[in-house]
Amino acid sequence: MDGFYDQQVPYVVTNSQRGRNCTEKPTNVRKRKFINRDLAHDSEELFQDLSQLQETWLAEAQVPDNDEQFVPDYQAESLAFHGLPLKIKKEPHSPCSELGSACSQEQPFKFSYGEKCLYNVSAYDQKPQVGMRPSNPPTPSSTPVSPLHHASPNTAHTPKPDRAFPAHLPPSQSIPDSTYPMDHRFRRQLSEPCNSFPPLPTMPREGRPMYQRQMSEPNIPFPPQGFKQEYHDPVYEHTTMVGGAASQSFPPPLMIKQEPRDFAYDSEVPSCHSIYMRQEGFLAHPSRTEGCMFEKGPRQFYDDTCVVPEKFDGDIKQEPGMYREGPTYQRRGSLQLWQFLVALLDDPSNSHFIAWTGRGMEFKLIEPEEVARRWGIQKNRPAMNYDKLSRSLRYYYEKGIMQKVAGERYVYKFVCDPEALFSMAFPDNQRPLLKTDMERHINEEDTVPLSHFDESMTYMPEGGCCNPHPYNEGYVY
């Protein structure tokens, strides 16, 4: 009995298994063929549509491949920085109800192949059919505003690749009726940069319009540009109006421009020059305008007088003892040597070291070193001597102002007309106030080394004390 059951049981089981296999084999074959046929049909339809529609979209948009790689990352970067949970209008997908059903049927297929980005996009494709079908068609001006109007409580269910989705809307604005091709282009795009989402701050930013760069990065380009160039202000305000919600964060950069400071600076510069020109003509009350016009060229030499506003009005008359020449004529800083010589010749008190010879415009330096010394006092050059003065006079030979009289020492003459000479030397009929020896001593106490003064003063007592000694010993000692 045991052996029979041992032999009979496999036989019975074999018959039952054989009969069961015979009945189930056609069913399994039919299922496998049906699955393979559906799989091949779905995959062929999917990839064929992807390739065809992607080529169609690229042909219509005419966007290079490098631009396609960078556009979605930049919007994802801006959304990552601003952290706005937004839901964007998706009108091109709303008329395609077949696409949503196809995406819902393709979810198991896509998930089995590990296309997480495709699965997320298909999940996104279903949502605009439920909540955003009655929205208006997109326009270039309404696309940036759409995050404000479509922020809803169900935005938390939006997957993360959807945040990178609005990056395609501005570049695709040139395609009015591209409803289905945009989906596949986005699907292919979103399947690529999902792995590179963390290092987004290093991605390029070429494919973005200017107004969305301003919306996504308001604090980087605009404070320095708005601070210096005020003509960017209307463009900036226009972009903030287009930006909608992003315009609420822009008033602080607008306050950085500090327009009152710029206008105050612009108004200070001409006012400083105008005050300077008025103090040039301080003593020339009847013809103040002529005095200003005469010194337009050399006016830049003493522009630092603008830093001392308390000396514009009353202190100019007390400045003969200072370094600058003080009154209207010398304040310009243009007192030349020939003008200085004319001023010395015009004063009869200086006739003991310089005087007219009486032969036209000839004059003689009776004491040339004294003339050189006074010129050094006038220009604050204590080392001035006649050699340096004569070299300066040679410059006027070439200019045709004066000449050296041949055969006579220290005799010169002016070659121009006397009236023209005095009109140029004394504009506005104002004589320059020349510095004296007392002023020179006051200046030397503060600024000039006293070597020359010490030699002249210490030599006399030494000469009186050293009379019994030989001159050489006393001089060396």
Curated annotation (Swiss-Prot):
Q: What's an example of a GO molecular-function annotation for this chain? A: DNA-binding transcription activator activity, RNA polymerase II-specific
Report the subcellular localization.
Nucleus
User: Which sections of the sequence are annotated for DNA binding?
Assistant: 335-415
For this record, the Gene Ontology CC terms, alphabetical, are: nucleus
Give the coiled coil ranges: none
Specify the superkingdom.
Eukaryota
This protein's record includes keyword Acetylation: no
Does the keyword Cell membrane belong to this entry?
A: no
Q: Where is this region: Disordered?
A: 128-179
> What is the official name of this protein in its record?
ETS translocation variant 1
The gene for this chain is Etv1
